[in-house]
Amino acid sequence: MRAYPLSIAPVDDDRPFFFRYSSWRELGGLFSADPVMRARVPPMERSVVALLIVIGAAALLCVQLPLRLLSRRPPRPRRHAAFFAGLGLGYMAVEIALLQRFGLFLGHPNYALSVVLASLLMASGLGALHAPRVVGALGGIRFVAYAVCGLILAETLLAFPLLPRLLTLPFAARAGLTFLLVLPIGVGLGAFLPTGLEALKRDTPEAVPWAWGVNGVFSVLAPVLSVAFSITWGMRALLLAAVPIYLVAALSYPASEPASRA
């Protein structure tokens, strides 16, 4: 089966891409001198590559150019870049995975879009509004990341397998349970960005727009990467992938900057 040119793996709820039968190995045809090989590359794979190229070019233009024009380079730019890029990638990975997971539980993607997105945005807003309290209560931005990662693991491994047993509940009860499961994760996710921006503002205020741009670029890049990732490994793996992303981002947070004062 691995040597077969087409993807014939069974479709399930974790990888609901019944329209996708091609393999990423066919991307090599894009660089072939044979026009027949180039024409065989499926449209979806072409689209992913095209989007990555366009967004990558925009990142170089909109992020790196302003950074070079700054009169003073921000300290430890790589660590700051890893932190804000990780926030953009991780947030969108969590959001997309939760939308798909709760779409099954709520019965329709539109319900998931309404309930999950509203819950996540409201919880993130609360986390951003009360970021100093959240970060201070947990003892620092890194401990917020540890808590968020623990919640993601607990819900993925313990809570989500139980959701099919609750499909007979009324819609209001399922929506309420969705809100309760999304709320703590969203509050933690919302505390990261304002904390990082506030710390950067104290140290290098002129680098704040650059950091915002890094986060924005990777937030736009993340959906494309998330689709490619989930098609290959599934939505469950996409949600779990947010764990190392946030851990790396938290470890990239400069230890000399007091997170609890954000």
Regions found by a protein language model. Name each.
Residues 1-262:
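Alpha-helical transmembrane segments of multi-pass membrane proteins
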